[in-house]
């Protein structure tokens, strides 16, 4: 016997379904559900009087030890927002990995069951929630361990960078120099609440200077102008990278002392490289570094300080830059060095290039001009700003922004994972990957997550007073949970190293307890592999006016005076926020 209910009632009970559109936070972005993999009338739902009970939605006979389809955790009826699509499904997690996405339940009484809920299964209600892959920040200065918690609080679960603490070299460059420092930082990573990967310092005129750092456990190399971004340094770093299958990140020569951007492109020679803060305010060939975004072998990223372009960007940047790069405001040459990097024309063009898909990755440059806890928030602020200024993307409409949403979520999930050689492990919601997942209430999307899973275990989330009678009593704050307690912290987190270090037992050599995994398939990556962000238009920058043209057309935008996901979320009692969430059929 069938029973019909309204879409509003259905959304209240089981969450939105196919054809419904959800507003993301207080932005003007709407995610339309493309498909629903659960079965109407057979939805799995936990609670008193609900169906996930013994002999009903929960199998009374299937054993975990005998049947690999029996999961450890089911997330029910979640809206998955990923580069693979925007859809609704149950998520099945076993041994810390996503083993099934579809319809979970009891195959004895339910049709079309993709994975089994048994007596061994925990339930997490995803009805009305959005689930995304944990964010990946590829531009992190390891200045203080506290950055990891700021990252988690905005949904970032993997950080890649370098440093040794608040040394001047680390304040400036994201590299950990030498085998001893790399080993110490690998040991330090044992206590971190996020996945980590370390970049060695590129330099020297022979391969061995960088090779010994890759062999010591660095997962990548970093070329930075403050240590010398000479053409020889770039060439030798890439030689090492090709030999060991690792990435090279490039902060190029702002002063053009050893060559211009064309010379750097020539020294790269068609090899894969990751270009940091490609607009140039964070550093790199002035004023025309953005030309590299035209090349298929160069993976261009942005950093959060200049995204989105607002009325406060320019005055904030000069002082930040002076501090981060150890410059002296009393020395005129240092001031001119800083001034050369802050150009409103290229900053304005950066927003548009991001929206076009010509810039592939978003990152933070944390504590060295950027804020690690704002990567995800600023990505969605930028997407909102671009929709308001440029209109819907091709194929989108007023209440359907799926193409733009897939473009922007790819910038901090799957694309950095591909660029750094870790996409087999993290970066998307796909079967076989580790369950590093972020759960959001739609009204809070992009600003403050509800809960964060690391390798399938609840690690961080909003929790009430621990002496209260229920878990939702004020004050409700983000807190560490059992996934980050005791030895579980090591078990649910990953340290990424070079394949050489992995095969030569770096884990055993250093006595590491974390899940140590090798990076691979890096050197064959091109910009065409960047999901929804693979455009390679011809980009030119006028050396006198700094105007930016794309395929001969001037591109720019106005600075924003007001942004979503801002003070409403940071200085308001969150329980009193009332943001309209749309669950309606879009025809």
From Swiss-Prot:
Q: Which reaction does it catalyse?
A: urea + 2 H2O + H(+) = hydrogencarbonate + 2 NH4(+)
Q: Which residues carry this modification: N6-carboxylysine?
A: 222
- This protein's name: Urease subunit alpha
In the record, the note on similarity to other proteins reads: Belongs to the metallo-dependent hydrolases superfamily. Urease alpha subunit family.
* Active site as annotated: 325 (proton donor)
Q: What class of enzyme is it?
A: hydrolase
Q: How is the cofactor bound?
A: Binds 2 nickel ions per subunit.
Residues recorded as binding Ni(2+) 1, renumbered to this chain, are 139, 141, 222, 365
User: What does this protein need as cofactor?
Assistant: Ni cation
Residue span, Urease domain = 134-572
Its annotated pathway? Answer: Nitrogen metabolism; urea degradation; CO(2) and NH(3) from urea (urease route): step 1/1
Classification lineage: Bacteria, Bacillati, Bacillota, Clostridia, Eubacteriales
The entry marks the following residues as binding Ni(2+) 2, namely 222, 251, 277
Q: Where in the cell is it found?
A: Cytoplasm
Q: Write out the entry's keywords from A to Z.
A: Cytoplasm, Hydrolase, Metal-binding, Nickel, Plasmid
Q: Give the residues the record marks as binding substrate.
A: 224
Any one GO CC term of this protein is: cytoplasm
Q: What is its EC number?
A: 3.5.1.5
Q: Which InterPro entries match?
A: Amidohydro-rel, Metal-dep_hydrolase_composite, Metal_Hydrolase, Urease_alpha_N_dom, Urease_alpha_subunit, Urease_AS, Urease_asu, Urease_asu_c
Encoding gene, per UniProt annotation:
ureC
Principal place where this protein is found? cytoplasm
Single GO biological process annotation from the record: urea catabolic process
* Subunit description: Heterotrimer of UreA (gamma), UreB (beta) and UreC (alpha) subunits. Three heterotrimers associate to form the active enzyme.
């Amino acid at each position: 016997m069938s029973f019909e209910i309204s879409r509003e009632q259905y959304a209240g009970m089981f969450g939105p379904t196919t054809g419904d559109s959800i507003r993301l936070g207080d932005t003007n972005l709407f995610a339309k559900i493309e498909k629903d993999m659960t079965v109407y009338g057979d939805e799995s739902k936990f609670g008193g009087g609900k169906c996930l009970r013994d002999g009903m939605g929960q199998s009374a006979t299937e054993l975990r030890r005998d049947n690999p389809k029996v999961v450890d955790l089911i997330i029910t009826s979640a809206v998955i927002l990923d580069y693979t699509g925007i859809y609704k499904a149950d998520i099945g997690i076993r041994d810390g990995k996503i083993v099934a996405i579809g319809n979970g339940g009891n195959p004895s009484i339910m049709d079309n069951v993709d994975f089994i809920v048994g007596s061994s299964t925990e339930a997490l209600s995803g009805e009305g929630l959005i689930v995304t892959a944990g964010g990946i920040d590829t531009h992190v200065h390891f200045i203080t361990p506290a950055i990891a918690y700021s990252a988690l609080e905005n949904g970032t679960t993997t950080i890649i960078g370098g440093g040794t603490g608040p040394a001047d070299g680390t304040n400036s460059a994201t590299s950990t120099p030498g085998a001893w420092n790399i080993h110490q930082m690998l040991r330090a990573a044992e206590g971190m609440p996020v996945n980590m990967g370390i970049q060695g310092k590129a330099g020297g005129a022979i391969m061995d200077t960088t090779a010994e750092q890759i062999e010591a456990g660095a997962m990548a190399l970093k070329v930075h102008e403050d240590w010398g971004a000479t053409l020889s340094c770039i060439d030798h770093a890439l030689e090492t990278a090709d030999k060991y299958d690792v990435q090279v990140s490039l902060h190029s020569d702002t002063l053009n002392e050893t060559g211009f951007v064309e010379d750097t492109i020539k020294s790269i020679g068609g090899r894969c490289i990751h270009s940091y803060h490609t607009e140039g305010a964070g550093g790199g060939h002035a004023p025309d570094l953005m030309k590299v975004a035209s090349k298929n072998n160069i993976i261009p990223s942005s950093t959060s300080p200049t995204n989105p372009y607002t009325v406060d960007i320019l005055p904030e940047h000069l002082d930040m830059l002076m501090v981060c790069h150890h410059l002296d405001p009393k020395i005129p040459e240092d001031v001119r060095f800083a001034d050369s990097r802050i150009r409103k024309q290229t900053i304005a063009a950066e927003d548009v290039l991001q929206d076009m898909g010509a810039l592939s990755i978003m990152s933070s440059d944390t504590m060295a001009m950027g804020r690690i806890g704002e990567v995800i928030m600023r990505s969605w602020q930028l997407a909102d700003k671009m929709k308001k200024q440029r209109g819907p993307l091709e194929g989108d409409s007023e209440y359907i922004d799926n193409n733009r949403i897939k473009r922007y979520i790819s910038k901090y999930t799957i694309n950095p994972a591909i660029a750094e050689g870790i996409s087999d492990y993290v970066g998307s919601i796909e079967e076989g990957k580790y369950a590093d997942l972020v759960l959001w209430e739609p009204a809070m999307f992009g600003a403050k997550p509800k809960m964060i899973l690391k390798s399938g275990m609840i690690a961080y989330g909003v929790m009430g007073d621990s002496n209260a009678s229920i878990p939702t009593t004020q004050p409700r704050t983000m807190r560490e949970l059992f996934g980050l307690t005791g030895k579980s912290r090591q078990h649910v987190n990953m340290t990424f190293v070079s394949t050489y270090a992995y095969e030569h037992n770096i884990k055993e050599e250093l006595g590491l307890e974390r899940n140590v995994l090798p990076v691979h398939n890096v050197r064959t990556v091109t910009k065409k592999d960047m999901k929804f962000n693979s455009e390679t238009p011809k980009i030119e920058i006028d050396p006198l006016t700094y105007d930016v043209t794309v395929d001969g057309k001037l591109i720019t935008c106005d600075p924003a005076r007001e942004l979503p996901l801002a003070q409403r979320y940071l200085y308001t009692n969150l329980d009193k926020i009332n943001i309209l969430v749309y669950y309606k059929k879009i025809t």
